Structures are given as structure tokens and as C-alpha cells.
């Protein structure tokens, strides 16, 4: 290693290297497909009011409020029913004074009507001369118990003007902001846009990352390893981490311990993606193939454990980050050095670090910042605390799988007692 730096220095250097990624282009996606999980690049503004027209909030009868003002149980108001209005295309005829129309939820309220009397506030409805003796009890709804046209209705409760009538713009006014820039689109956001008649959404183009695993010993998880071979955990893990941080995987490569093959693969990755991310071949062993293939990249030792060996620079003009090959080291490196930068480039906020109390005392070697795997535990007296999971080894993937957080122990700290406050990085 050519130099040794602390964690914050390396974080700052990585941030400078990747600063250009923050200026993301935009693209249009359809609300029908491809919008889920994308980040809005600009506010979404309603092109018109929602609802677009006056419509009924209930199944019932559209009336003039003045015509039913005196209605009460025992002294109903009887009105002729002059038609039906369904939630269907078309515009209903104006309502004449002293009449009613049967109306369905969402149907346009006729001009002249200023209130809707719910079915529950009617007692007897006559259908083509046949009297129904209890509309409230038998659940008469538009087109439900009776599909014939109603001719007369007895209303037992008056309704004030405006009751159960949805006015245009009462949900969303024309020109109102429906969705804010930076929103991560979920199904309910897509629904809001579609309901406003917005078919296309402007989203940020995610950072495209090439994930390159190095090592002749690696085989894919669906292959049978031979003697001395292991399954590649870093490729799938870091590809998933990239997507979880708002990026996209533009290329997945696994290359053997051959500097020329590695160099060719990385140049191909640089031509296709915004960022190249490698794992393995960056320490001080005899076969550190990434170091051999990239003499223009800075390799250094960062005062942290796990994840000390790191590299950063450019290949073919593209930024490249080189992480260690041990699985825990690679995942910790992603969380500490890259996750928030990818999120920022994608328009997402950083993952908030969380203070926590230790469940038990720990000791830590001086001189290296420790990032221990931890999980949340419940203490009946002290409440939620964080406990160390597994040992310090950078190969212990089971402990990483069981962890909820990384416990951050400063380099100068050699012991922390039970109950001591620590900073955690959520995984």
C-alpha cells in the first residue's frame, strides 16, 4: 500500500471522485410500466382539477336541498324520480324543481341538483309502479337490488346544499403540486398521477454501475465448485446493494487472476457504465491482480476493520472504486464509502446513522476504526439495545446476514462498557 489514511479522508476522496455523478440526466417513464421505484426529477403538477366535474359521493338520489329541507322520520318528502344517472360517459339532463334522479357513486350530479340523499335516508322507493317497503333495509343501490327505473322516492332526512356532492378541484386543484421532486415512486404515487390524467413522469436516470468480481477461484452460485474454488458472494451482494441504493447494474463481470484480462474487462465496463466497482486483488499479497492491472489507480490502506485495503481512481476516464475481496469487507466498504453517494446521485437522502446503547461491553484494538456487525435486541429494563454479532473476521458472511447495523467504534477507543452509546449504520 502506498499510503495510509483514516476513514473520513477516504470518504472525502471518494466523494470528490464521484462528484460528477450527482448531475444526473432525466428520462420519461410511463405510469403503466417502469415507474415503480424511480425518483421524480421534478414536481408533478395537476393539469386540471380533480374531480373534473361535480359527482356523487354516495349511491342515492340527487335533489334540490330546498325540496327536502322538511324531510324527517314520520314526515317524509315524496319526490318523483325522473331518471337514473350512472357512473358512465355522458352528461345528465338538468334537474327540475320538485324532482329527483337516482344516482350512483361517482356519477355526474345534474345541473340544478345541489345535494345527494343517500339510499340510507330513503324509506320507500317505487319501481315502475311497484312499491318497495324498505329501501334502507334491503340495500337498494343503483343497479343492485332493482335494475328497473325508480319512479318515486320517500325521503326521510333532508340534506343541506353541498352534502355528498364532490365539487371540481375538491381533491386536487388545477396547478396544484401532486407529487414532489425526489419522491420515490410507489403504487399510490402512480395512482395519484394517473388519476390526474398524467401518463408520463420525469425521473432521474440512475447511476449505472459495473460490478466486477476478480479471482480465478470464483464460480457462480449456480455452478459446482472444483478443488480450491468458492462461490462468488461479492458479485450478487454488491449488485443488490447498488439497486437498493437507487443505482442500476449496467454490467456484471467475473474475471480471472490475469492482469490483461482484468484490464480488458475493466475498460469494457468503463465504456458501458458510469462507475466501475471491483472486488478483490487490492491487498498486499502475491496475486493482487487489480493493482497490477490498474497502475494509474491509487491503492491505500484505510485505518478501518474490516475493509482496510481500498483503491480509487479512473480507468478509461471513468471513476473506479476497488474494494477488498473478503465478503464482509466488501459489503462494509459499500455502506461506508459508496451507499450514500449513490443515493445522493439518485435524488435520495442519505441513510441516517442511529445512536444506540450497547447490550454488552466490548474491547477494540487501538488505531483502527472498527465497524462491527450488530443486531437490535430488546431489554426489558433498558429498551432497545444493540449487540455485536459474530467475530471480527472479514470472511464471516453468516454474521453479516444476521446483522441489522454496523456498530461504529472510533479508532482511539479500546473499550466500551455495557450501556455505552455508539453510532450505528443501518444495513
Q: Residue locations for each model-derived region?
A:
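Short, glycine/charged-enriched hinge/interface segments at domain edges or termini
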Residues: 2, 44, 62-256, 385, ...
Amino acid at each position: 500500500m502506498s499510503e495510509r489514511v483514516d476513514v473520513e479522508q477516504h470518504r472525502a476522496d471518494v466523494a470528490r471522485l464521484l462528484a460528477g455523478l450527482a448531475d444526473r440526466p432525466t428520462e420519461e417513464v410511463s405510469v403503466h410500466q417502469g415507474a415503480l421505484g424511480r425518483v421524480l426529477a421534478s414536481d408533478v403538477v395537476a393539469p386540471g382539477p380533480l374531480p373534473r366535474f361535480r359527482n356523487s359521493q354516495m349511491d342515492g338520489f340527487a335533489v334540490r336541498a330546498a325540496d327536502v329541507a322538511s324531510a324527517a322520520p314520520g314526515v317524509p318528502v315524496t319526490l318523483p324520480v325522473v331518471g337514473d344517472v350512472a357512473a358512465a360517459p355522458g352528461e345528465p339532463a338538468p334537474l327540475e324543481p320538485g324532482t329527483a334522479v337516482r344516482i350512483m357513486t361517482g356519477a355526474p350530479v345534474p345541473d340544478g341538483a345541489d345535494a345527494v340523499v343517500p339510499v340510507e335516508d330513503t324509506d320507500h322507493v317505487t319501481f315502475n309502479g311497484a312499491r318497495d317497503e324498505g329501501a334502507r333495509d334491503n340495500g337498494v343501490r343503483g343497479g343492485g337490488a332493482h335494475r328497473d327505473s325508480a319512479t318515486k322516492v320517500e325521503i326521510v332526512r333532508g340534506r343541506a346544499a353541498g352534502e355528498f356532492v364532490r365539487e371540481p378541484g375538491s381533491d386536487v386543484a388545477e396547478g396544484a403540486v401532486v407529487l414532489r421532486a425526489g419522491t420515490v415512486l410507489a403504487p399510490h404515487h402512480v395512482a395519484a398521477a394517473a388519476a390526474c390524467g398524467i401518463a408520463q413522469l420525469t425521473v432521474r436516470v440512475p447511476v449505472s454501475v459495473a460490478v466486477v468480481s476478480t479471482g480465478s477461484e470464483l464460480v457462480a452460485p449456480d455452478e459446482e465448485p472444483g478443488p480450491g474454488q468458492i462461490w462468488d458472494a461479492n458479485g450478487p451482494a454488491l449488485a443488490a446493494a447498488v439497486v437498493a441504493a437507487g443505482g442500476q447494474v449496467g454490467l456484471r463481470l467475473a474475471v480471472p487472476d490475469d492482469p490483461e484480462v482484468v484490464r480488458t474487462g475493466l475498460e469494457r465496463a468503463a465504456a458501458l457504465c458510469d462507475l466501475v466497482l471491483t472486488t478483490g486483488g487490492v491487498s498486499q499479497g502475491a496475486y493482487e491482480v487489480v493493482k497490477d492491472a490498474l497502475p494509474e489507480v491509487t491503492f491505500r490502506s484505510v485505518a478501518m476493520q474490516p475493509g482496510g485495503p481500498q483503491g480509487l481512481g479512473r480507468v478509461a476516464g471513468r471513476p473506479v472504486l476497488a474494494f477488498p475481496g473478503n465478503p464482509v469487507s466488501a459489503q462494509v466498504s459499500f455502506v461506508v464509502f459508496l451507499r450514500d453517494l449513490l443515493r445522493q446521485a439518485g435524488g435520495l437522502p442519505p441513510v441516517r446513522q442511529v445512536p444506540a446503547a450497547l447490550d454488552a461491553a466490548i474491547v477494540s484494538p487501538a488505531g483502527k476504526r472498527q465497524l462491527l456487525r450488530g443486531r437490535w435486541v430488546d431489554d426489558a429494563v433498558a429498551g432497545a439495545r444493540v449487540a455485536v454479532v459474530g467475530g471480527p473476521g472479514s470472511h464471516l458472511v453468516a454474521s453479516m446476514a444476521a446483522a441489522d447495523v454496523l456498530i461504529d467504534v472510533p479508532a482511539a477507543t479500546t473499550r466500551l462498557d455495557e450501556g455505552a452509546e455508539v453510532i450505528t449504520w443501518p444495513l
